[in-house]
Amino acid sequence: DVERSRGLGDVYKRQSQQGSGVFVDPNFQRNAFRIAAPSPGDSQDLEHILELMLSIEVTAARYAAQRRTDADLKKMRQALVGMEYALINDKLGDEEDYQFHQSIVQATHNPHLVALNDYLEANVRRVIRSARNNTARRYAERMAAVQSEHQAIFAAIENGDPDAAGRAAEQHLRNAADRLRLFQAERPAPV
């Protein structure tokens, strides 16, 4: 019987053995992949996260363009329509944004990329998502540009063009990073 438990921010694997009790597997932490939660105010930490996200999302977009099915395209299109609806109705659309990016990773049909993306969503991606939130709240006029970036990614994937999909995904993430940096530069310093 194996359990995972959270305590003080760390993940441990506990094993129960009849007659022996419960113990922590000493190799689990050493072998477990973890990323510390990024600090939104740390620009170097942000750069490292963005490099990681670029390597994953550009690769995912390229594979999605090669492997996507009609069902995958339908999921992406639904998320795009949801984001468009959110824009028209002055809503954030962050859940639809997540669904769009998730559908791209799922279209790779690579279970390891999907699992890594799920991990990053739970632990890291919120930094990237804050770029969208800040753009929507403070720079509403830029949301149309964000939507256009998403449409470019989708069009390249739909056309089965991995190079264009990779370029569009990279441009989108670089623009998201710029939007986040702009927001951070305008934030008042903590007192």
Residue ranges and their predicted role:
Residues R142, Q147-A155, P162, G166-V191:
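C-terminal-biased regions
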Residues N31, G41-Q44, I56, Q78, ...:
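Alpha-helix N-cap/N′ positions at the starts of helices
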Residues P38-S39, R132-E141:
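Short helix-coil transition/hinge motifs at the ends and kinks of transmembrane helices
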Residues M53-A131, E149-A152, A164-A176:
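Conserved amphipathic alpha-helical segments that form helical-bundle/coiled-coil interaction surfaces
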Residues D1-Y12:
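Single conserved hydrophobic/aromatic residue that forms the stacking wall/gate
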Residues R30-N31, N123-N134, R179, F183:
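A short secondary-structure junction motif
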Residues G41-H48, R68, H109, R138:
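Non-transmembrane, amphipathic alpha-helical segments
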Residues K13-E51:
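HTH-adjacent hinge/linker in prokaryotic transcriptional regulators
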